[in-house]
């Protein structure tokens, strides 16, 4: 069975930080591939300042640079889903012989409680959280940790995640890449 890591986002714009966490996820989790799911419109982000889906897809393709195991897709547009909690079940139906692992940065973990039916994500597929700036004591307290603490795998057992039944998750402490889409849009460099 193929195991795919799903990295969803606006990718406005895509950057080396996205590639960085994808490469670590491939290696540490033993994934067959990572799909960058470029969201038509993140419900938690304003439309003002958002590049078109076509522009964001092209930018993501440029960063991926034909990596054989990282694929850029606008599958949410084709599925007609708006929320991750709806996208994952639709993907599982469409690809019944594929195991999915949801990938996210610690920056998103800290605010996942704002996502539509966020607990459904953890109950649907294993989740891997990868370090993103800023790092500190923040991951010691968040709603996902409070709710699913007993299902948290230690990093040295992260490779088991692809065989685990949800809810199961891990936090991968990887070297940090400070790039962020917000900083790039604001003209900052890192």
Predicted regions and their residues:
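Nucleotidyltransferase catalytic core that binds NTPs
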Residues: 1-190
């Amino acid at each position: 069975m193929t195991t795919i890591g799903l990295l969803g986002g606006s990718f406005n714009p895509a950057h080396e930080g996205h590639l960085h966490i994808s490469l670590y996820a491939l290696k540490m989790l033993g994934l067959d591939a990572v799909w960058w799911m470029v969201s038509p419109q993140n419900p938690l982000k304003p439309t003002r300042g958002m590049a078109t889906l076509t522009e964001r897809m092209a930018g993501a393709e440029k960063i991926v640079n034909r990596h054989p195991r990282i694929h850029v897709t606008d599958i949410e547009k084709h599925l007609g889903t708006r929320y991750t909690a709806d996208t994952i079940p639709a993907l599982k139906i469409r690809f019944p012989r594929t195991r999915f692992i949801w990938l996210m940065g610690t920056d998103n973990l800290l605010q996942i409680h704002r996502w539509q039916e966020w607990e459904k994500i953890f109950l649907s597929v294993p989740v891997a959280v990868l370090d993103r700036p800023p790092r500190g004591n923040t991951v010691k307290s968040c709603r996902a940790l409070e709710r699913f603490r007993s299902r948290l795998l230690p990093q040295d057992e992260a490779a088991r995640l692809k065989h685990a039944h949800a809810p199961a998750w891990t936090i991968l402490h990887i070297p940090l890449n400070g790039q962020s889409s917000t900083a790039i849009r604001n003209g900052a460099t890192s």
